């Protein structure tokens, strides 16, 4: 976990990892994508993120599993019932009709998911709660031989308990690092062996934010996922 990249670079990297190296992986792969649907994300950035997700999922191979989880203001109450899951067909039909049907269903489901998210974006952002849902997805599909987590967000945690825009534990990198380690211990998230890719979406939340806090927010997430056992 080195840094937070632009969402485009992150999605391109994941597409390459899940495509070009396919022959070296035994068994199905699992990809979980968390996408921030709060109103702090600029609409154009949200549109681009959904388009990129569509492209990445369409490149999956037979047997691969994908879950897309919205990042809302309360993951347990609002996000858990809105997860969409896809599994690429394993049994080939004539002329690859199964893949054609899969991609048509995929496109329709993503369009419905996006329309619902953009029609009524939430005012708050529970990224930590969404990560907990991602861990549940990985445990539910324990047979996958390779797992990856992609998070597309502005990474400004803002729920009923924590607000990265104001919390003094996000005022400097040193304090943020310590806070991240404490948070990882408190949440008990286990991502050992799971690479995590952080894609930064353009957000209204960063307007007027001091540089020290921006850097502290990035440091928090880098240290948090490292403390959770992420491998990259």
Show which residues each predicted segment covers:
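Bacterial N-terminal signal peptides that target proteins for export
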Residues: 1-8
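Bacterial signal peptide processing site
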Residues: 21-23
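Sec-exported extracytoplasmic/periplasmic mature domains
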Residues: 54-62, 111, 132-143, 157, ...
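Von Willebrand factor
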Residues: 27-150
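VWA/integrin I-like adhesion module and closely mimicked acidic/polar interface patches used
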Residues: 156-216
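C-terminal motif of bacterial Sec signal peptides marking the signal peptidase cleavage site
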Residues: 16-19
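Acidic/histidine-rich, surface-exposed loop or edge segments in extracytoplasmic proteins
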Residues: 28-40, 110-116, 199-204
């Amino acid at each position: 976990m080195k840094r937070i990249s632009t969402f485009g670079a992150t999605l391109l990297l994941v597409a390459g990892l899940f495509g070009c190296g396919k022959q070296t992986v035994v068994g199905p792969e699992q990809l979980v994508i968390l996408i921030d649907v709060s109103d702090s994300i600029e609409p154009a950035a949200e549109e681009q993120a959904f388009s990129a997700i569509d492209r990445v999922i369409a490149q999956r191979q037979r047997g691969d599993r994908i879950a897309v989880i919205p990042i809302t203001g309360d993951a347990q109450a609002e996000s858990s019932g809105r997860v969409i899951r896809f599994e690429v067909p394993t049994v080939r039909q004539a002329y690859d009709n199964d893949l054609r049907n899969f991609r048509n269903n995929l496109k329709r489901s993503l369009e419905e998911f996006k329309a619902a998210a953009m029609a009524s974006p939430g005012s708050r952002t529970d990224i930590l709660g969404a990560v907990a849902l991602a861990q549940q997805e990985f445990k539910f599909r324990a047979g996958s031989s390779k797992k990856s987590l992609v998070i597309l967000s502005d990474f400004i945690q803002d729920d009923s308990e924590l607000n990265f825009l104001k919390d003094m534990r996000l005022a400097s990198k040193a304090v943020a690092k310590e806070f991240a380690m404490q948070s990882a211990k408190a949440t008990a998230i286990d991502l050992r062996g799971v690479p995590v890719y952080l894609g930064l979406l353009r957000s209204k939340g960063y307007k007027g934010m001091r540089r020290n806090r921006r850097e502290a927010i990035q440091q928090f997430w880098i240290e948090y996922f490292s403390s959770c056992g992420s491998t990259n």
